[in-house]
Amino acid sequence: MKTWAIGAMALGLALPAHGNDTTATVGVGGLQFAQNENVRMLSEDLYLSMDEVRVTYEFENLTDTDQHVLIAFPMPDIESSPYEMAGFPTDDPENVFGFSTTFDGQPVEAELHQSAFALGVDRTKELQKLGVPLAPHLLSTEDAINALPDADQQVLVNIGALGAHPYEDASGYHSPAWTLKSAYLWDAVFPAGEIVEVHHRYTPGLGGTVAATFVDTEYGQRAEYEEKYCLEDNLVAAVERTLTSPDEPWSAPFTEAWLTYILSSGANWAHSIGTFRLTVDKGSEDNFVSFCGEGVTKTGPTTFEMVQEDFYPWQDIEVLFVVRREDY
């Protein structure tokens, strides 16, 4: 895959997760993604920004009989970390991302399926038995944990679901240590030989930092970013030119925001994706964005597009937004 990075035209440069529809089964141990050879994804039109994710699909039933399919749309994993910024659009534990969908123009009531994993083991039942909410990022969840009897807290510690609170002045407190995995499910009927359109939208949950960490060569994550986001030297150099103190790599007037889109689940349908179109919007001309792709073109002041035919979504999309701070 060709690497490339997109910068801000204002700085003189020429041209840095959520998921695909998939079929599913619900079995012992939770949601399982299944292969479907009877329905093909003809096209996918995906729009990614810091404010909104939109995706429109066209599906074709390749058979002469109606296909009844359980569709799943996996959302990004949610963790609770005191060391990284993570922005969640709402405090609604049942619809954190404000997800909505239509099937052939009609609204769909999707069912949310959630599981809590600690040390790779599904611990949903243990948490629910104790009345602990599954959303690890909410303060109400932490309050519920620390209201439990010590014996119950110790049970959760023993199975890896709780960790010590990271701040010294909170000695004796615990924080969630599990990962919440979520997917929206609904039953769909694909009419024999016909094409239907499916549309989703939601507000992404973004991770991030308070600085452009990749500029710091001693403690930064340059190598990781080069692999994950295809970060290139011209973007790094542009950010370095904005340093208010040349010897202080954290003095650049930028923050980071990270977006993950689960694209690989789209490989569960018959054949490849006929036409895949990706649009990434960096939000402001003063921002930068970096990610991996091929044949990208600039389509507007802040938008960039990639179009691929017979596309196989073997890996997910990782986007790095380098955001100019408003106070500079």
Label every model-predicted segment:
Residues 14-16:
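N-terminal signal peptide c-region/cleavage motif recognized by signal peptidases
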Residues 2-8:
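Sec-dependent signal peptide recognition
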Residues 18-328:
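Lumenal/extracellular ectodomains and adaptor appendage modules
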